[in-house]
Amino acid sequence: MNFSEAMQMLGTKLQGKYGHLGFKYKKSDKTLTRHSKNFTYMIAFSSFGGNTKDSISIEVCYIINTRPYDPYGYAKPDINTQPLFYSLRDNEIYLDIGNEEKMDNAFEIVCQWMDKLLIPKMNELCATE
């Protein structure tokens, strides 16, 4: 299994769990995303290479940006334009999706942090819209 295939599997599982909240997995961006009137809520996934068929390391970031989002970075991210940016790797949480067992473990960890960080902040921000 390669990174794209593994991410498609993980993204599909996450969309299955969080789809009722409006989250969709975008294969091209490797993000699980939901938009509201004023914000974009996402989990962004990446990999730094060095992967094998049995070991696929991923980086997971939980991000909330104001809309419209400035993809070119003209607006410096701050608490007003990016109310949440949390990287698992920066917090020494390393995930591997290289096989089914590792995928299940990574899925549980991604969901734990989603439920702990992104969902409460999303509910708080949506209540103000």
Model-derived features: positions:
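Intrinsically disordered, low-complexity regulatory regions enriched in serine/threonine/proline
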Residues: 1-13, 25-29, 33-129
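Acidic, metal-coordinating catalytic segment for phosphate/diphosphate chemistry
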Residues: 18
